[in-house]
Every structure is written in C-alpha cells, then in structure tokens.
C-alpha cells in the first residue's frame, strides 16, 4: 500500500507540489500533490478555519469527538452553504478500544406532515414546494446529535468547544472566492425571504464579495444560548420559540412540540468486507453504507487491477454494479423504524454474486431491464463531510447537511441560521424524481416523525482490526459512488489517499439511464467504447467533495486529503 506518490519524497505537511498532467489507462488525471501528513491527529474538512479549530482542540488534549463537535459548530458559521445547526446528519465513530458505533441525527418530518402535502388537488407535484421555504424543512437534528456524541465520548465541555464558532460569528471572517460565488449563485433564493436577505446579503442588497468580512450577530447569539444551556435551548427554550414563531408566520408546520420530541438515535453500523478490509458505515435511514457495500461486493468478483484503472471494462462493471444498487435503493430503502428493510440480503455476498451473473461484460444493461431484486431471499447530496483522527486512535466520520446549498433558503428570524429542505428527500410522489434525480417508492413516503432516506455515507475502514481509513463526501445522489470509488482506488489500484481523492469519478444511478463522467475524466477511446456498449455517456460537473484520512497501520502515521474539486 503506497502512502505517497512514487515520484516524490516525503516533506512537511500541507505542501502543495503539483506535477504535470498525465493519462492513466483510460483516465485523464492530473498528478496529485502529496498527502498531508501527521502523527498527532488530523482534521480534514472543506474549510480551513474549521480545520484549524479542530486541530487546536486536538493540540489542547481533546479527542476526536471533541474536535468533531467544535468543527461541526465552526462549519455552521464559516461554511453556511452546508454547515449547519438547522439540518441533520450521520456520524460513524471508531474508538481507540475498538468500539464501532453510528449516530443518526437525521431530520424528521413534522408531526403535521402528510404523504400528499406537496401535491395539488389533481395529485401533481407542486413545483418547488418541497425545496424552498418553511414548508420544505424537517425538524433539525444537528444540535442534538453533536451533544449526544459529546456526552457519550467527549472529554471537554460544550461551551469551550462552541466558543471559536461564536467568535467567528460575532467578529466575522473573510469571504473566500468560492463562498462569494455561492452567495451570488443563490442570492435569488435567499432574497425571497426577508430574514435570509438580512443575514446573507449586504444592507444595500448586494452580494458579499471575496475578502469582505461576513458577520453573523444573531447566529452568535444563538450559539451562545446553546453553549450556556445546551441543546434544550434549541429544542425547548428560546430558540425553539423563534423557530415555531417563524414557522407559524410563514406557512411552515414545525411546532414547539415537534422540536421537544426530537431525539438522535444510536444505531448499529452496517458492516461488510472487501478484499480483506472491514467496511463500517452508516445504516438506514442512510442508504449510503448499504449500497457502498453492495457495490463493492459485486466488484469483488472482478479483477479490477488486471482490467486496468479507467479502462472500458473496469468502468463498465463499475457502472453496472452501481445501476443494480440504485434500483434496489429505490424500492427497499427508508426509515427502519417505519418499514422492514432486507438489509442482510442487500449486503450479502450471495446476492452480489446473483447481480454479477446478470452483468454482460460486452454491453450495458438498459435500466428499463433492471428491476429491484429479491434481497430478502439472501437474508441470514448539498452536504459537507469531515473526517477526524486523534493521537489515541479514536476516529469520527461525519456527514451533515441542510440538503441543497443554503437549504430551503429560509432563515429563522432572530436566530440567524438557515433551515434545511430535507423534506425533498422523501418520495413526495412515488416515481417522481427529487432535486438529485433520485426516484423513490412507497418505502420512503412522508409520514409524521419519519426520517427521510439519505445517501450520506460516512465510512470507516479497518485492516485486521486496526484503523485504516476515514472517508466521506457530500454530493447528493453521487455520495455513494464517490465514496465507493475512493475506497476502490486505494484498495484495488494502490493509490495513495491524495491520488485516490483527486482521481476522476463516474456515476450511474439507474434512473436517469446515463453514465455521468466529469469533464476531461475519461479519454476519448474509452468514451467511444462505452457508447458502443450501449451507454449514454454524459459529461457533468465535479462530483463530490471528499475529505479522507488514511492511516498506516504499522506506524500510525496519518495521511490526509481534501478534494480540489470544491475548495472553500
């Protein structure tokens, strides 16, 4: 297993040496910078300020869980497109003593939610009703989730960990170029809501530009209340009052009772194996871990290394494995507290062998010919992710979200934070795609207090019981395939973590029936071959924003990589 590119020597952390662009089999890939390196702990998120805050916690003797809480609140301030206290997510935790657990702090549907709440009198979907505004929001889980993690595994107090976020909200921070782009892109949505316009645009109505200082006084006040009074301030106290009042005034349905009822859930992780490595990931209501394992199980029967990274054959079997997994996702996945999910069947090696037997090595299978399988017979995205490992070997993989960039676009008046639009992750009408193009069925229909299906895939990998990789990504429907490809790049193709993250990605999700590739990702001959095989190859924008840490089991040295696709 390589931890650095063969062509360069190990030098200090955060070096950014870039070499020439070179083809690798069927992929056009820029040669990667060396990974970041550390022996005392590592934090990888999409935002430098948040990384620095997390690392400071580790330097001051905090553990990975302490750092995860501090980073979560920091991202709510310095990464408002996705960092949040108005959304929810999932955490996978590995402790130094070998415990593996997951925490579900996904949003839930309000108590007044109904299966047809986004349909008109003729049964048609009301445009944007599940995407924009107060009615699109589920009951947030982030604040409860971060506190649940801290209470069980943390070593520091909440007030100490939130204080850096309060400081940046109170005093402001300099807007980056990428943040300025998103402010400009999503200004039309934010301007629709008076509180959001007040918080995220300048007083003259113009957008914040690169280098300007962005201050969030009301958010600082909200965070201070949480620091002083804990999650009860959010779910039962002053902040709950503000949320309920704003909902009532703007057509939303979240009530104080809904907030008071919210509870995060500790769940058993979904577990699998791949070529001798143990995969530990998030179980339902996230579909991520289940289908990462399902795809890897199918691929395990192919010699990917001999096929060649980026070759027509390797991309073909990968796309077919993805196609079958997403077909099953549409049929079987939902909130396990409301439906029975054939989980053991979906992740079984026998079921993977059955899928593999259906793959024609010479041609693509039309998605119309792929139906959800019978996994029970085998019983026996926008979002942000961060990965943290401490010097003792505790690790946290967290993906949390308000769904779309800037969520529903609606901010809570007087509280300074955006509400999610996670209700769009339900099947608002079976057979109708959501904003990510995903088609759902009755298993994911709206019900009061139900958790919507997710693709979030925080994942931890062990090798012979020792911590090996912490990985995850945002990206909506592409999260599953993004994380799976990074894992495969390391295990199958012997890439170091920077190369594995930088490598071009492909995506197939059953419906729509198209193979998505990144710009300049596949060489022309491979695209032509795949087209002849029957694929509709479509070039899309960047896929995912991985933050990953690879640990050398023999030395304990950590190697980290952020994603060059979406740097904030």
Question: For the regions a protein language model found, what residue spans apply to each?
Answer:
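Internal maturation/activation junctions in enzymes
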Residues: 302-402, 414-415, 430-431
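Bacterial N-terminal signal peptides that target proteins for export
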Residues: 1-12
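Extended C-terminal subregions enriched in glycine
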Residues: 450, 492-541
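Active-site rim segments in enzyme catalytic domains, especially the processed small/beta chain
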Residues: 77-102, 253-255, 395-463, 493, ...
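Sec-dependent signal peptide cleavage junction
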Residues: 18-33
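Alpha-helical support elements that line or immediately flank enzyme active sites
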Residues: 57-58, 144-152, 229-236, 241, ...
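Noncatalytic scaffold domains of N-terminal-nucleophile
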Residues: 31-52, 64-65, 69-229, 234-236, ...
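Short, small/polar residue-rich loop motifs at catalytic or cofactor-binding pockets
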Residues: 265-266, 380-383, 453-456
């Amino acid at each position: 297993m390589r931890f650095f590119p063969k062509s360069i020597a190990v030098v200090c952390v955060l070096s950014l040496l870039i070499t020439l662009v070179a083809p690798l089999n069927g992929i056009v890939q820029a040669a990667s910078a060396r990974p970041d390196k550390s022996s005392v702990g590592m934090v990888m998120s999409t935002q430098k300020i948040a990384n620095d805050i997390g690392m400071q916690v580790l330097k001051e003797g905090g553990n990975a869980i302490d750092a995860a809480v501090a980073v979560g609140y920091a991202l709510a301030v310095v990464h408002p497109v996705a960092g949040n206290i108005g959304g929810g997510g999932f955490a996978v935790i590995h402790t130094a003593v070998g415990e593996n657990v997951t925490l579900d702090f996904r949003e839930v549907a309000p108590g007044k939610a109904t299966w047809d709440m986004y349909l008109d009198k003729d049964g048609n979907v009301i445009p944007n009703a599940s995407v924009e505004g107060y009615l699109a929001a589920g009951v947030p889980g982030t604040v409860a989730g971060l506190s649940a993690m801290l209470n069980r595994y943390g070593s520091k107090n909440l007030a100490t960990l939130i204080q850096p976020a309060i400081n940046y909200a109170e005093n402001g921070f300099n807007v980056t170029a990428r943040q300025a782009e998103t402010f400009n892109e999503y200004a039309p949505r934010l301007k629709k809501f008076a509180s959001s316009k007040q918080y995220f645009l300048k007083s003259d109505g113009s957008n914040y530009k690169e280098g300007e200082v962005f201050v969030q006084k009301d958010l600082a006040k909200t965070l201070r209340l949480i620091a002083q009074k804990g999650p009860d301030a959010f779910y039962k106290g002053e902040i709950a009052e503000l949320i309920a009042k704003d909902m009532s005034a703007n057509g939303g349905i979240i009530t104080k009772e809904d907030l008071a009822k919210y509870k995060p859930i500790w769940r058993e992780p979904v577990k699998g194996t791949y070529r001798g490595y143990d995969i530990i990931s998030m179980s339902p209501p996230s579909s991520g871990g289940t289908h990462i394992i399902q795809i890897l199980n199918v691929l395990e029967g192919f010699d990917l290394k001999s096929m060649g990274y980026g070759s027509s054959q390797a991309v073909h079997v990968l796309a077919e494995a993805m196609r079958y997994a997403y077909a099953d996702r549409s049929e079987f996945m939902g909130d396990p507290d409301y439906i029975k999910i054939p989980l053991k069947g979906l992740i079984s090696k026998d079921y993977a062998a059955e899928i593999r037997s259906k793959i024609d090595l010479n041609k693509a299978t039309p998605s119309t010919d792929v139906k959800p399988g019978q996994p029970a017979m085998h019983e026996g995205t926008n979002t942000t992710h961060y990965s943290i490992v401490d010097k003792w070997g505790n690790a946290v993989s967290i993906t949390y979200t308000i769904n779309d960039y800037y969520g529903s676009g609606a901010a809570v008046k007087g509280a300074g934070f955006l509400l999610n639009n996670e209700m769009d992750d339900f099947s608002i009408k079976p057979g109708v795609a959501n904003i990510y193009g995903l088609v759902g069925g009755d298993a994911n229909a709206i019900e009061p207090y139900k958790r919507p299906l997710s693709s979030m895939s925080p994942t931890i990998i062990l090798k012979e019981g020792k911590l090996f990789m912490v990985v995850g990504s945002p990206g909506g429907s592409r999260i599953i395939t993004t994380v799976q490809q990074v894992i495969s790049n390391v295990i199958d193709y012997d890439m170091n973590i920077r190369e594995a993250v930088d490598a071009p990605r492909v995506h197939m999700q059953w419906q729509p029936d198209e193979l998505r590739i990144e710009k300049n990702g596949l060489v022309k001959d491979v695209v032509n071959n795949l087209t002849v095989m029957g694929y509709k190859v479509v070039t899309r924008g960047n896929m995912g924003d991985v933050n990953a840490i690879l640990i050398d089991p023999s030395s304990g040295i950590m190697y980290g990589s952020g994603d060059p696709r979406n740097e904030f």
